[in-house]
């Protein structure tokens, strides 16, 4: 058997693909099919039973049912066994597949060996090959041929050998000679002269017709021509779509036809040409005809027409049919005919034109049909172009009759004739005349003005009546010139009008103007118009002349009455542009409601107006008819306009053709100079002398120079609404009213003069001497292109030496700018100018007086202040220790008073900004700059110290925790008096006395009655003792002795009449002689105190002109909101008509209407009781203000002896050369026995045994005040907390003590105990007695002392709980560090006191939690650190309001909050990566269970669930001792064993969400972390997500996790609130902490 491949089966018949070997060896069935079979069988048997059983007996039915159930059960048991076995069948199946594969391989090897053996033994023995023809095969394979092929086969199949190339060349060369001989000997047509002979054939070519090839078949002369090839050259490139015009069948037909005709023809070549030439001409005519039809159909419509078409003969087409219909001359029309030559058919197509055209143009037209591109469109275009040139030449000839010396141009395709109408003229302004190629009609337009209204009329004249062209071109010339005027003025503030409603007499020169004129309205000058009259030059019509007229008009209306011209019987001219005659209906209908009445007119000489600065204006007379000018009466405006002249002649500039330089120059000249004319007229009306309008040197600009400026007048206060109402009532009253009543009403309604600084004649003359020149110029603002008035005031030098580098020269220029208003608003510009001038004058009055004092060495002003800049409008003074802060002084023209603007240095703001209103009022009352400088110098240091107090608003201070309250609120009262409010509860009154001293008293007490307390504030208990710790007796007495040495007693007595003038005005704050403006520190008088200012003697600052923000008008301690005129020191000042203070008065007058006499109140008053307009107020005395008193700083000196009287000299210090030393002395009207206190009240450190001891001022040095206000660490180093000022710590401690007292009175379970020690709060709760007191050493912190009281047995018979000393010590320490600590929140104290009310066993567990909070290092192995939270933070679960107390007891259940923080447990793990949770805990005293307070949520947070589950598991599994509270064991177990579900996390990347809120938080001791300054904000590069089990914004603020080398912060002191201070560097933490949490 032949061998077969294995793929075909072969001997191995059982071969199957891999993986299917088991299918033949075993009967396999899918398990699903098997289950189907079993179910079907069971269903079938069940169906049979259902059908058969009803027929059987009961026993048989039972037997059948049993058999069915048994068999079915056995079947399904087997199926179940099979299914269970199928779980392991895969291993057996794999083994079976391997065995099958190995069997198949073995079988293949055996079969292969058998097959090879059979082939070798049987098949190959008998194998043989046939005899092949080896030689023939070799020959064919090697040579490619077979030489032994029989001849019979070779002759029939193999072709003969071709001739050789040499024989071919010889034959063709011989044939060429034969053809050439025939052509030479025969006759040849001229059209066939173009031929070529090559390759045994001759090819004739007739251009644009055909190309034919012929040859001969022998060299005999009788052998006919043989036609080889025909190629037609006629093409239709426009409509042929690239296809051949002659079909190949047609070419074959023509080929056969010509071949048949030339066989027997004697002149065969002529016959060939004739046939082909006729056919090509017919084809060309057909192509042209087809193109013409397509043109008519697609584009030209009826503009062309095929008049005649004879196939193969002619084609006639007519064009310009519209012109043919309108032009009577063209009777035959415009036609062209394409035809063959009837005489000589051999010629090409000819074109005939009707009418005829020149030979040259005709030859060009013939090219359209004798070129490669056969096109009827080209023929028509060229013909129309030739016709258009002819028509345009005719028009040109007509125009040359009246437009000579004009350059005409005919150019372009289609041809255009350009005609310039002006000289110079833009190409776009030429008249373009062309011929419509479709109709032959003439068209014209001006490219630049396509909307020209003259063009339709001119086009009609070109096609019909050429006689109108001259007039129309002239009108076009004027029209284009008007458009040029518009183009020229497009960037100038003017607009052109063709018509304006002008009213003038018929004899007015405007009526004699020509019809062509342009009206120009100036935008900025509504009362002036410019008329430009246009005329053509007679010698050269293309050039225009311009005449300018300036017309002054007045807007009027028809209702105003008839004009004087009408009244005189002369009808007015209604329109200057030429309208209908007046009186006609159409004229009345077209008459505008508003018109312009012509007042005067001035004609400009164009040459003079455009050359030179001294322009002469030619003014023609109205009655003059000639061109000469005669004089007439000139109006004031004409006189002003006669001064108008442009700058000097500029270099000639080449302008574009559309630009009219004369017009632009005149318009710009008018626009530039008319404002100056109007301004000069306004100056003249106000009697301000000026030098008229001038041109500056080198023609740079125009300038209006003022000779001088007037002295400012005191401004008038606007009338009040009541006065305006009275005026209206008086106007409505009849004229018969009583004259007296009307006079009284008029005097009452007169405007009152505003109080301004008096301008002394000497000061005014000094200012005018320095004023060198005043110039007014016009400028353009480059930013918004608006015009401005620039006023330049040049002064000589400066009265004050300035440090500014630009103010060193002797020429000082001041520039003031104003917006250029319209003509009707020019008075506003002058008002602004005079207002700014008053700004300079009033400031100079201050500077002039200040200059004398500044240069006086005795006043030592240069050491106090440096003049940074004085620009005559602003004065900038630098002061301070390093001269780094400044004050800017200027006059406010709107408010009519001086303004002060304080600016700080590079490091801080200016502390005087808070006193700006008071200092500003003092300056505007006294007008003494030196006083203000002294005040700034003396009060800079204390104000800078006070400015260090924090003014941050805090929440949870009031009962409503959401209302913010300022920590410190500074309320200025006068330049030397201010109040400081702490959290809206306490108030301190600080008075600056000069000489480095100040006084502080309790501002809660009234100045008039120590037993009376201001309603808004609460007395500060212990203030006197606290301040006495900072009193420096040596510094106080040293300053006092220096003052006595520098200021000896004055020999002048108080009875001296000259002393009385120095004591008028409101007394300063406590000692103020400076309050009234005359009693200045330079007046020589030390000043007299008011009756209510017995304490502060020498400080004579201004009266407090601004009431406190929280003043009560019904309280004597606060000034009335409208009665600040009396000053802080006295009720109405000192002086006046029989009032308090002036000369010696009786003691009966020394009282206020709202307060008892001052001798009974040795404490200062904040404000006076008199109104500003009270007659008891003394007026300033210029004599006293400028008196040469020598005392420089005496008003800042003060004494400290505690006397209620001012430290006055025995006599007033008006004696020349007397320094006027202030010392204790009884004032007039009071005897020395009225002294209430002595100096020991100031110097003693013993706390006075009076409740109003704080009302007595305490004298401190500025250094002590700075110590009070500067933030410093706590005096006790072991007490943690942020850096606060001692004053804030003291007030905060007093505030917390007051809150404790309030809570004790409110809580029934707390019993207050009376204490003999002042300032100590003693109370008891349960069996413990608590004592809260201020630290006696520094009085900056509260401390708690707890003692156990001896108690009898309880009500239930049990002995009282005995507290361990260590537990009580923990409670005291917790109070010191967590409760009475910043930020001093009442809720913290409330939480602590509620904790004290709890049962002893609960309180004991709370103390254990406090122990872990304060000392977490005591317990080792805790996973969490705990912190007791006493105030609800914003991040807590919304169970109780934010900021309120955290300990609540209700129905034997106690709610409290703790915060736990995970101790770092991974390497390199930091505190900022730790998890912090705020847990609201609930302790049930009945059940003794401690659980987590959870909100009822469908999906509680994961961490909440973990903590809650942990506490439930503890309550279920823990075993407590009898009577043991589960509170602390539950918390301790939580700290020891709580493990979160997702521990351990990656360091720094744990993100968790608890309660649906994710909050970032930092670690302890870092900014933003626990103890950081942000307390719960992002701290560090990795934000921490804090869970919301009520999570805190700053975890474990007080947890000492860094103590003992562990890196936890020291216990914080931020009121027990989460977010307190972090650990300091001494506790091992990385950084110190700051306040945190929601303050």
From Swiss-Prot:
Residues 575-586, 722-748, 1589-1603 have a biased composition (Low complexity). A motif (LXXLL motif 2) lies at residues 768-772. Residues 711-721, 1219-1229 have a biased composition (Pro residues). Residues 1189-1201 have a biased composition (Polar residues). Residues 561-586, 709-755, 1039-1243, 1558-1639 are annotated as: Disordered. GO terms for molecular function: transcription coregulator activity. GO terms for cellular component: core mediator complex; mediator complex. Keywords: Activator, Nucleus, Repeat, Transcription, Transcription regulation. It comes from the Eukaryota. It holds the Pfam family RM8_Med14. InterPro entries: Med14_C, Med14_N, Med14_RM2, Med14_RM6, Med14_RM8, Mediator_Med14, RM3_Med14, RM5_Med14. It is found in: Nucleus. Belongs to the Mediator complex subunit 14 family. PANTHER family: MEDIATOR COMPLEX SUBUNIT (PTHR12809), MEDIATOR OF RNA POLYMERASE II TRANSCRIPTION SUBUNIT 14 (PTHR12809:SF2). Component of the Mediator complex, a coactivator involved in the regulated transcription of nearly all RNA polymerase II-dependent genes. Mediator functions as a bridge to convey information from gene-specific regulatory proteins to the basal RNA polymerase II transcription machinery. Mediator is recruited to promoters by direct interactions with regulatory proteins and serves as a scaffold for the assembly of a functional preinitiation complex with RNA polymerase II and the general transcription factors. Component of the Mediator complex. This is Mediator of RNA polymerase II transcription subunit 14.
